[in-house]
Amino acid sequence: MHKSNCFDTARLVAAMMVLVSHHYALSGQPEPYLFGFESAGGIAVIIFFSISGYLISKSAIRSDSFIDFMAKRARRIFPALVPCSILTYFLFGWILNDFSAEYFSHDIVRKTISSIFMSQAPDADITSHLIHAGINGSLWTLPLEFLCYIITGVAVAHLKNGKAFIVILLVFVSLSLIGSVSENRDVMFSIPLWLYPLRGLAFFFGATMAMYEKSWNVSNVKITVVSLLAMYAYASYGKGIDYTMTCYILVSFSTIAICTSVGDPLVKGRFDYSYGVYIYAFPVQQVVINTLHMGFYPSMLLSAVTVLFLSHLSWNLVEKRFLTRSSPKLSLD
């Protein structure tokens, strides 16, 4: 799976894009917005969801059952999330509150458990004094992605019908269009409802590409599709949902097209630090920015080095052990 693609490197780059983008926001500056479309971090999330949809759908096809498939997904998400949640609230949060004994009166245990179950409890009571409130704002995408796993598991691992992804993709396209004109801003499971359809679209676009790979995985087809999408995006710039939807599809298709065209000289399946970088970056950056008071770029560099070290520990001490336990051959799907 790793010899002729660069999915692992792409995920690591996307995780670092989130770190860089968030560093602006956490420092009280506007995040860099690219092409009037999304922040750098937002584009990174699209990359994550596209790759996840592509790889996870293939994992579902190979799985023996829905339970087998979801067990694999749980082993990928929760083992690393548990220590991260504990460190976030019992160490990083405590540091951010000057090691105050009163800090632990703010339902820290409940907040930690909520984080482990991907349902973040309100944390304004422990972070309102920071430049940008929030203890780990990146985790909002996890329940969203896990719901995509469940839908994928039902559609493929249980029904064994890859064609279901076309229907699911069309549903998410429709929901994205409806959400773009709706004034509903309700929140469910800590997620603003309007954020889900477009991210889900990226996931299931990647999944659909995986199911019909033979029809597009040719250099001429890839170049033609990317060129047409890019031209249409340019022509529709400033036209609201028309431009946004085109850009989501363009980023999703381009991500999969590039990753399946380029080899991986860096990672080659040896490790996957991207998840660790993603879940540890936000709280580490909060600590560095709000306690060390360094310059913008030095604090970004220190955050990146610290996060890469923590992700290295997370991979080698936790994640890899649970992934190899499921199979004699390491799988990063």
UniProtKB/Swiss-Prot annotation:
Transmembrane ranges, per UniProt, are none
For membrane topology, the record states:
Peripheral membrane protein
Record InterPro entries: Acyl_transf_3_dom (IPR002656), Acyltransferase_3 (IPR050879)
Which superkingdom does the taxonomy of this entry point to?
Viruses
Return the broad EC class: transferase
Q: Which GO terms are recorded in the biological process aspect for this UniProt protein?
A: polysaccharide biosynthetic process
Q: Which GO terms describe its molecular function?
A: acyltransferase activity, transferring groups other than amino-acyl groups
Q: Which UniProt keywords apply?
A: Acyltransferase, Host cell inner membrane, Host cell membrane, Host membrane, Membrane, Transferase
Which protein is depicted? O-acetyl transferase
Q: Which gene encodes it?
A: OAC
